[in-house]
Amino acid sequence: MQKRVRNRLITIIICFCSAALGISIILYNLEKNIVFFLPPSKINEIEEGKELRVGGLVKIDSINKIAADKISFVITDNIKDLDILYQGVLPALFREGQGIIAIGQLLDRKFIARQLLAKHDENYRPPS
């Protein structure tokens, strides 16, 4: 093999290995952010006290107002339910049967949310 062809082949192999290593490092570091939220049925796999996002539908007749700015409710993915406790201002789209994402921690098998995000479908129309 000529020296020029051999050097080109070595350069291509080094570039390919560098790109593969870079992509591996990026995917490893983004592992927890690839999935935006977990459904309630996957929560038992998570250790308590770890910050995470859970999502599902607010179960009908589960909203319980504790104080002026504190509520508890249940979200479901039709497989498992999860109790959520939230203190703060509710999103405008928050209601029973609505999809939500809660950001917070799991403590004593109850999810303590510090932020709620209300989801809507592609046919969103603001409340009139």
From Swiss-Prot:
Keywords: Cell inner membrane, Cell membrane, Cytochrome c-type biogenesis, Heme, Iron, Membrane, Metal-binding, Signal-anchor, Transmembrane, Transmembrane helix. The keyword Metal-binding applies. Pfam families: CcmE. GO terms for biological process: cytochrome complex assembly. It is found in: Cell inner membrane. Belongs to the CcmE/CycJ family. Heme binds at H120, Y124. The gene is ccmE. InterPro entries: CcmE (IPR004329), CcmE-like_sf (IPR036127), NA-bd_OB-fold (IPR012340). Signal peptide: none annotated. It comes from the Bacteria. Heme chaperone required for the biogenesis of c-type cytochromes. Transiently binds heme delivered by CcmC and transfers the heme to apo-cytochromes in a process facilitated by CcmF and CcmH. GO terms for cellular component: plasma membrane. GO terms for molecular function: heme binding; metal ion binding. Residues 1-8 are cytoplasmic. It is a single-pass type II membrane protein. The chain crosses the membrane at residues 9-29. This is Cytochrome c-type biogenesis protein CcmE. Residues 30-128 are periplasmic.
